[in-house]
Amino acid sequence: MKIIHSADIHLGSKIEAKLPKDKADIRKSEVRQAFNKMVSYAALHEIKIIMISGDLFDSGVPLKKDKDYFYSVVRNNPDIDFIYLRGNHDIKEICLENIPGNLKTFSEEWTTYIYGNVSISGIELTENNYKNAGLRLDLPADTTNIVMLHGQHDKLPINNLKNADYVALGHLHTFAEIESNIRGKCVYSGCLEGRGFDEAGTKGFVVVDTDKIS
């Protein structure tokens, strides 16, 4: 099975601080276009899961038009599960009555979604739960285990996740593979679209092949 790992999309980012309004509006549309292209890639290649490891939105109180845009993309792709872990910039509350059925979310306790022999677990870390979070997740040795986390890697409970085959990280805006003592890989996908000169270079997402990581 193939899964997309993405993060740090920052829908609704206020790019006006660095650009005139007309050019900022163009850049905002390009952020959406990058997200659309990723979803189209998934549909074209029959990838059924898109992981978003935090900072889908740029604000904890995103504009209605940005939420509506995201929900419309999810609803228009019912064959794809969007697994969304909120990050430090993200929307604080999700109205569970309105979210599409194929949008999967997390909380401040570990949540696991099962797809055959593949488990995808995640937790939204806070000051109250991050110190012992890794000790509360039991990853079986005989399954392919993916873990989603958002934050600076040296402050995350990665080394407690011994049986993790792939840790899908968000927070850094460039691709990076982090050293750890888990049995698999620990990866920042980077952002989909750079929003300024400080985010130059190749951007995009990671395609995870579960047959090759376990």
Question: Language-model features: where?
Answer:
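A short C-terminal boundary segment appended to hydrolase-like catalytic domains
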Residues: 210-214
